[in-house]
C-alpha cells in the first residue's frame, strides 16, 4: 500500500501540479480510486487532469465520479480498466469531443469494447469522417465498387456532435450484416473500410462481434440506458459540487 500511495503522490504532483502537502492529502483517495478502476497512478492522473479542466467540481468529487463510471462500465459487461486505460491514453481526443463531463466518450468506450475495438480506432473513424472532402470521395468509391449507395452523412453528423457510440452504430448500419460482408470481394471490403477510416480486420471484427453479441438496436438501447444512468449520476455529482 505504501508503494501505491507514493505512486499516487508522484502522479498527483506531475499531472495536477499540486504541492507536496496537497498531494499527500489527496493520495489515499487517489490510490483507492486507481485500485477500484484498475488504472495505474499515471493513467488516473491523466484522467483526473482532463476531467478537472472541464468541471468546477472538487478533485474528491471527480474521483468519486470516476469510481461511479467504473461501476457503470462493469454493469454494462465490460472491464472498467479496459475503457479507463483507453481514455487515459487518448486525452487529446477526450478533450476535443467530451460532453457532459465525458459521459459520451465513456459510453463510446463501452460500445467500442463490445465490438472488439479500442478508442484509438474510434478516434481514427471520427477523424476520417470529419475530413469531409476525402470522406465523401471514399464514400463514392465504396458505393461504386459495392454497387449500392453508401451514405455516411448521418455518421459524420454524429461524429461532429460527439456521439461516437451512435457514429459506430451508423457505420455498422451502412456496412450491413455479417452474411453480406462475407460475400464481398477484397476490394469491396477494403473500399468500405477506407471509407470509415478503418482496416478490413477491424471492420470484420465489428461486424462479427455485433452479430455474435447483439443486434445494433440492442447495443444502442443498452448504451442509451447506461448513458441515462451516468447522466443522473453526473447531475448528482454536480449538486454535491455546489456544496464543496
For the regions a language model picked out, list residue spans one by one:
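Amphipathic alpha-helical assembly segments
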Residues: 3-244
Amino acid at each position: 500500500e505504501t508503494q501505491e500511495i507514493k505512486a499516487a503522490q508522484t502522479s498527483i504532483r506531475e499531472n495536477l501540479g499540486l504541492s507536496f502537502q496537497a498531494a499527500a492529502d489527496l493520495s489515499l483517495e487517489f490510490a483507492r480510486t486507481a485500485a477500484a478502476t484498475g488504472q495505474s497512478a499515471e493513467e488516473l492522473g491523466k484522467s483526473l487532469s482532463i476531467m478537472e479542466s472541464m468541471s468546477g467540481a472538487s478533485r474528491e468529487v471527480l474521483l468519486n465520479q470516476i469510481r461511479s463510471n467504473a461501476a457503470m462500465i462493469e454493469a454494462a459487461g465490460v472491464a472498467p480498466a479496459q475503457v479507463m486505460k483507453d481514455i487515459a491514453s487518448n486525452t487529446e481526443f477526450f478533450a476535443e469531443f467530451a460532453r457532459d463531463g465525458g459521459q459520451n466518450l465513456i459510453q463510446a468506450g463501452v460500445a467500442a469494447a463490445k465490438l472488439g475495438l479500442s478508442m484509438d480506432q474510434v478516434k481514427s473513424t471520427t477523424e476520417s469522417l470529419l475530413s469531409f472532402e476525402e470522406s465523401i470521395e471514399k464514400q463514392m468509391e465504396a458505393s461504386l465498387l459495392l454497387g449500392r449507395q453508401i451514405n455516411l452523412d448521418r455518421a459524420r453528423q454524429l461524429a461532429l456532435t460527439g456521439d461516437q457510440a451512435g457514429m459506430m452504430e451508423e457505420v455498422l448500419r451502412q456496412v450491413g450484416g455479417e452474411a453480406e460482408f462475407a460475400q464481398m470481394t477484397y476490394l469491396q471490403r477494403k473500399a468500405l473500410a477506407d471509407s470509415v477510416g478503418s482496416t478490413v480486420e477491424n471492420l470484420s471484427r465489428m461486424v462479427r462481434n455485433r452479430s455474435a453479441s447483439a443486434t445494433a438496436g440492442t447495443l444502442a438501447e443498452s448504451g442509451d440506458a447506461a448513458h441515462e444512468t451516468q447522466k443522473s449520476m453526473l447531475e448528482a455529482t454536480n449538486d454535491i459540487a455546489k456544496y464543496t
